[in-house]
Amino acid sequence: MRINHLSPSSHKPDYTHRRYSCIPALWPVCLGFEAEENARQNWEHTLNFIGEAYRINHELSPVWTTQNQITLDLDTMYLRDFSTGSQNLPVLLDAPYAGHSATIVDFAPGQSLVKAFLDNGHPQVFVTDWKSATEEMKDFTIDTYLEALNLAIDELGGEVVLVGLCQGGWLSAALAARFPKKVKALVLAGAPIDTQAGNGVIKKLTRDLSMSNYKALVKRGNGRLLGQFMLQAWKGMHPDQQYIEKYIDLFLHLDDPHYVKQTETFARWYEYPLDLPGAFYLQVVQQLFKENLLVRGEFMALGKKINLKAITVPTYLLAGKSDDITPPEQVLAATHLIGTPPSHIAQKIVPGGHIGLFMGHKNIHEVWPEIAKWLSGMTD
């Protein structure tokens, strides 16, 4: 049952009894009044906390900040159009398909990667809004998603600036290597290209756990990797923060509307996971993370073995210094794996972790505008 939040005025106690506190004979009575009032306030605060904690975990869902329309509806995704004008090369943001909504690229006012491109010389922006997998989608493979990405590019005229984020990064790199003429410039941000580089958490998990463990997870989801499984795994990486500290912080800041709004904004995205097709997920674990086939030149994409050296277009590599999901080494390895001349490769390591690469305030207002302008200079 949802607990209704009390209005701020209901938190204001009536202290009229304190006018009598100067009378020694009434001190015990006044202390009793204060104890009762404090108990009532604490109880109301606790009820509000319970209601808000339930709300952020169960009642919120992802929202888009910037006006857009669906221009293509596929089994795997919606292709969303955020354009405010036209340009020679549209920008296609390939959002992560790793258990959370694509709204990370349009997270909140002032924290929108979409807006960063729109406001910095790229009026035509599209986003791959990957769909949560239904049971009917359980047998979809990597090829299914490559085919969808390829179709989206065709829908946009056959040539794009492709921006691959997180798990969308390796998919974008594979697409660019498979169809090099369709990608005129490439950005890889927080993207695991060489999955055996560095000391990331995912590298460790995929190294230490056998495929039977991953298959068991998919079996539990009736052929899918359920988003809730992934969410609990991510939370388990920082249990103190996720299960204790964030609730203490919420309790202490419950009367701060700005804090509550920020908490709800993040919860809309983080606490609303997507399911993945089991076949797709198991292929990613086996072929990309365990066998590192993309780097070895052994990865099959839509019937053809691909080589990252086929990528020769201007490429920007962005990594987070303290990213424990995709350490910088995994991203920057692309420098010597792709065929682009060094003079047309830019790279940057920014302070912070993984998620902040795509929605952190400083990155959105300083780093991504720089990338957008670099792309303009390279593709004009």
Where do the language-model regions lie?
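Catalytic histidine-centered segment of alpha/beta-hydrolase-like enzymes
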Residues: Q347, P351-E366
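Conserved alpha/beta-hydrolase "acid-adjacent" motif
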Residues: D324-Q330
